[in-house]
Amino acid sequence: MEAKNITIDNTTYNFFKFYNINQPLTNLKYLNSERLCFSNAVMGKIVDDASTITITYHRVYFGISGPKPRQVADLGEYYDVNELLNYDTYTKTQEFAQKYNSLVKPTIDAKNWSGNELVLLVGNEWYCKTFGKAGSKNVFLYNMIPTIYRDEPQHQEQILKKFMFFNATKNVEQNPNFLDNVPEEYYHLLLPKSWVEKNLSDKYRKIMETEHKPLVFSCEPAFSFGLCRNTQDKNESYQLSLCLYEREKPRDAEIVWAAKYDELAAMVRDYLKKTPEFKKYRSFISCMKGLSWKNNEIGDKDGPKLYPKVIFNRKKGEFVTIFTKDDDVEPETIEDPRTILDRRCVVQAALRLESVFVHNKVAIQLRINDVLISEWKEASSKPQPLILRRHRFTKPSSSVAKSTSPSLRNSGSDESDLNQSDSDKEDERVVPVPKTKRIVKTVKLPN
């Protein structure tokens, strides 16, 4: 099987080891995209059902390393505290959390920032909207590649605003209560690389640098049209639609999450373009999409969507993806997800960025590890009877009624009795035009 030959950085990567067993759940918001790792290209073969021709393809698998320092403007190399805490939750020792809680957090809680090496970054857009002025002249891009959406400059400008920050460390030193007024989603705490080297053990840092795990992350709560059968696959397979933006007015958290996902897709494209063995697929690689937009128009008001695959064991006819309905008392596992086909709902899904398929079509393989359903949604509008609506019209006006025959007036009155619903007010009214009597002259032709 192709998955047995996967290596990342010359180390065998056990692809199946993490399925539903101790999988780390990464917070995409804080992820340094440079942590994304790529396996060797693994070759596979499939038989095309239409032509019975054997097709050779390649697949590159993904993993992530431990947190890496990043160059932050002209400040130097720093680690994001939330990224370190997120990574630390699935280590055995949780060494960073212990060091952080004993050395750094007490000074933050005591609002004593002097000499603790922490750097505070605050979102510039939020600060300007809240206080009506810029926080600093020195604003810089943080946690996003500058080339994102480079072919869509208008959309790029709107997105990059969400990732512009300024160094607010002096603000909090001068005003100890400054951080109390900043929502958590609009700031980042940073620790210098020197702090990590000084306070964390060599063993812990070696694991951060050399160990690879799958990239599994949770999406923001999203509306879904429900679990549906994949009609393009002749075998039994399923997918779940995810509408990533709230209609008309998306939240900042949704915009940031979607941009971070597209950042990962951009990293994949760049890697494939630089790989010599994929040179002949370069045109297909350039067309590889991250998120799906209506009519392929990035920035469309409907927002981006994802259609990840549900993991389904065809041999056993069982779902590997776990579906759970949130409940006030206790979450309930849905034993047979086929019972909820096409039911609209609001969900949070744990998504696994698994691999990229490379042939005459290049596509990221995104699979769903588990789904948490928070609520069911009914359709916002019910089907309307088109035939009845087509024949609707109102009572004729008094002037028209006087000029029409009694039979026509009665007919109009009876018809209007069918149209008493509130929706009539929105329909276009059609007033019948009175019939005029036609006089036809006959002419006798000579014999």
Swiss-Prot record:
Q: Polar residues bias: where?
A: 408-421
Output compositional bias ranges, type Low complexity: 395-407
Superkingdom, natural source = Viruses
Q: Where is this region: Disordered?
A: 392-435
Question: Protein name, please?
Answer: Uncharacterized protein 007R
Q: Which organism is it from?
A: Invertebrate iridescent virus 3 (IIV-3)
